[in-house]
Amino acid sequence: MTLVQVKDKEFYLDDFLKQRLDNLKDIVYKKNWDGVFIIDGLERVGKSTLGLSCAYYLSDGNFTVKNVCADGDDAIRKIESFPDKSVLLIDEGSLIFNSRDAMKKEQKKLIKILNVVGQKNMIFIIVLPSFFDLAKSIALRRSKFLLHCYTDNSLVRGRFAYFGEDAKKILYGVGKKNYDSYEYPKRSLNELGRFTDFNPLGEEYFETKRQSLHSALHEDERIKKTDLALRMILHVDKYVFPIPFNKKMRREMLGIDERTYTKYLELATTGGVLATTLS
């Protein structure tokens, strides 16, 4: 490992990882590309710590709690306001509390976010529990590499495995068929690294994570309430009436104008209400 100094802080970086991060800095800052990569691992293995270390190094120390995105909506706001070639980190650990529908909705936001990241030549770090939960377009096509965090047999934190672009493709295909296994393709000794407990943001970062988790815990509840409200407004059970009711008849019966009705239909397709509600 190499002792690096960034501004007034010193911390250790794995030699192989430092090379990969230096390559990423060159791609973004000198060649005007974007740099997206993924860090995953089970809960409490240290993936957020590794993410902060990478972000702080890549930004040359210009990384604060404002560069951390609590969720997709927060990321959209920050990407629009931050200058080109900024470093942002989104910690999606909260996804473990979300339903499958909520996760799909969040990933649709991520895809849109990554399009803007590319236009603004940003570095964007995605931290989440499992690489296999990501859509293929994010996991394979829009990310440079994966750092998978894990512990040793004694549950000691601070280890990661590196998967480059080609290795990610094999991992995604084979691993998904084997209960999300990370065993294949095998990693060389260089691609198995260590990291230290370095958190440049201190308690501020943990407060941001708590807010993200709180939002995720209440997300399903909010969706259920919205779903119920829209069902009451729009859903007409066809078996109650002797004839089927089309969309125009529903609008007229409920006294809802076409614009409002269209808005609710849009919610149905974007996750605000179940798609079956208005079928």
PLM feature spans:
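N-terminal pre-Walker A segment at the start of P-loop NTPase domains
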Residues: 1-28
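Glycine-rich phosphate-binding P-loop
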Residues: 36-59
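Post-Walker A helix-loop "phosphate-sensing" segment adjacent to the P-loop in P-loop NTPases
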Residues: 56-68
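Conserved nucleotide-sensing/catalytic segment adjacent to the nucleotide-binding pocket
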Residues: 68-126
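A short helix-turn-beta junction within AAA+ P-loop NTPase domains corresponding to the substrate/partner-engaging
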Residues: 137-157
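Phosphate-binding and hydrolysis-coupling loops of NTP-dependent motor/remodeling domains
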Residues: 152-224
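Short, amphipathic alpha-helical "recognition" segments used to contact nucleic acids or chromatin
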Residues: 221-244, 265, 270-272
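Short coil turns linking two alpha-helices in DNA-binding domains
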Residues: 257-260
